[in-house]
From Swiss-Prot:
Function, in words: RNaseP catalyzes the removal of the 5'-leader sequence from pre-tRNA to produce the mature 5'-terminus. It can also cleave other RNA substrates such as 4.5S RNA. The protein component plays an auxiliary but essential role in vivo by binding to the 5'-leader sequence and broadening the substrate specificity of the ribozyme.
One BP term from GO: tRNA 5'-leader removal
UniProt name for this protein: Ribonuclease P protein component
Catalytic function, reaction form: Endonucleolytic cleavage of RNA, removing 5'-extranucleotides from tRNA precursor
Disulfide bonds: none
Gene Ontology molecular function: any one: ribonuclease P activity
Subunit-structure text: Consists of a catalytic RNA component (M1 or rnpB) and a protein subunit.
Cellular component per GO, a single term: ribonuclease P complex
Region spans: Disordered: 33-54
Length: 140
């Protein structure tokens, strides 16, 4: 199942910003790049919230998620698309627990295609990476 449009990281500019300034965490199958919401936007939101207290919930940006999978992972597009679908399904399950305003890019390593692991293992690895970067609510 695809991510909601409001949660998709699409623009090249956003991807470059995450790669340039974001945090990096690694696991056996993925690298997670995460860019925190900027504090300048938070302070401007706080001043706007003081003048308009009823609309402060709508001002919080949603978390944007992108998946990067190169042909080094697999030459076959069918395999790459299957892995990408599994990752987006796992991220959709984790979406309600993610802190708002983050920009996340999941980079798939070639080991993901070599090992025949399922979406359940992908979900566990992504949850662990998100907890390490402190993106999950109630991270451990």
């Amino acid at each position: 199942m695809a991510l909601p449009k409001a949660n998709r990281l699409k623009s090249r500019h956003d991807f470059q910003a995450v790669f340039r300034e974001g945090l990096r965490r690694n696991s056996s199958h993925f690298t997670l790049r995460a860019l925190k919401p900027s504090s300048a936007k938070k302070s401007s939101l706080d001043t706007a919230a003081k003048t308009q207290p009823a609309d402060d919930v709508q001002d919080i940006p949603s978390t944007l998620i992108g998946v990067s999978i190169s042909t080094k992972v697999s030459k076959r597009a069918v395999v790459r698309n299957r892995i990408k679908r599994q990752i987006t399904a796992a991220m959709q399950q984790l979406l309600p627990r993610l802190a708002p305003g983050w920009k996340l890019v999941v980079i798939v390593k070639p080991t993901a295609a070599e090992s025949k692991c399922g979406s359940q293992q992908f979900l566990q690895e992504l949850e662990q990476l998100l907890a390490q970067t402190e993106v999950l609510h109630g991270h451990s």
